[in-house]
Amino acid sequence: MSLNAYLVLAAMLFTIGVFGIFLNRKNVISIMMSIELMLLAVNINFVAFSHYLHDLTGQIFTFFVVTVAAAEAAIGLAILVTFFRNRTTINVEEIDTLKG
């Protein structure tokens, strides 16, 4: 496949992720999945440019992005589980009512 095909695929995935955030603002899990989809699109760009430029920097950077994304997802889900235990909902509109 050519570089353009990878860039079009990444652009489509990123656009789907952005639309997922804007169209579904009430569910935290859907928002987190959309963010992960956007990170996947960025990683595809890194790997595609790294392959076509014959430089391993993009592929190595992708490993760091995947690691940070996994940590972000784990922390986000842990916060979400704690929030669900306290409020019995995962509605985004309820999150701003936290005491602090």
Swiss-Prot record:
Keywords: Cell inner membrane, Cell membrane, Membrane, NAD, Quinone, Translocase, Transmembrane, Transmembrane helix, Transport, Ubiquinone. Its EC number is 7.1.1.-. The keyword Chloroplast does not apply. It is found in: Cell inner membrane. It catalyses: a quinone + NADH + 5 H(+)(in) = a quinol + NAD(+) + 4 H(+)(out). It is a multi-pass membrane protein. GO terms for cellular component: NADH dehydrogenase complex; plasma membrane. It comes from the Bacteria. GO terms for molecular function: NADH:ubiquinone reductase (non-electrogenic) activity; quinone binding. The chain crosses the membrane at residues 3-23, 29-49, 60-80. NCBIfam families: PRK05715.1-2 (NF004320), PRK05715.1-3 (NF004321), PRK05715.1-5 (NF004323). Belongs to the complex I subunit 4L family. NDH-1 shuttles electrons from NADH, via FMN and iron-sulfur (Fe-S) centers, to quinones in the respiratory chain. The immediate electron acceptor for the enzyme in this species is believed to be ubiquinone. Couples the redox reaction to proton translocation (for every two electrons transferred, four hydrogen ions are translocated across the cytoplasmic membrane), and thus conserves the redox energy in a proton gradient. This is NADH-quinone oxidoreductase subunit K. It comes from Magnetococcus marinus (strain ATCC BAA-1437 / JCM 17883 / MC-1).
